[in-house]
C-alpha cells in the first residue's frame, strides 16, 4: 500500500491525519454509507466491484480488527455478508453515516489509542491493487445539487478536472 501510494487514503483518528504505517490501530473503520444530503448511493457505486471490495477488506483485516458499518437499507450481500470484518448496521438520519459517530457507538477512542478510517470507495482501490497488481483510481461520483440540470453518476479518476464533467450539465454562470 505504501509503495503504491494508497496508504494515504487511510486516515488516523484522533486528529484526522494520514495514518502512521508503523502504528498499531485499535481498529479500522469503514463506513459504507453516507447520510449527507446528495451523497452517492454506495450500493450503486459498488455494483460490479464486489470482488475488489472484499479483497480490500481482507487486506485491512490483516492489519487490525476491521469494522464495516452499513445502513439498515443496504441489502447487497457484499455488504451484509462481508467476510473477515465485523458488520454493524446503523439507522437514522445524518449524522448516522458519519464514521466518527459510528466509532463512538462501536468502540470509542480512549486516551492513547488510535483508529484508522477509510471511505468504502477507497477500499475498492486497495482491492483492485491486490487483484490486478496495478493502481486504478477510477471512482464513481454523484453529480447532484440545485445547479445541476441533469443529476447523474460519473466515473472519473481521482484528481480529474471537473470542467468537462460540469460542461452542459450545470446552470451557466453558477458559482461552483
Predicted regions: what they are:
Residues 1-176:
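Buried, small/hydrophobic-residue-enriched core segments of structured protein domains
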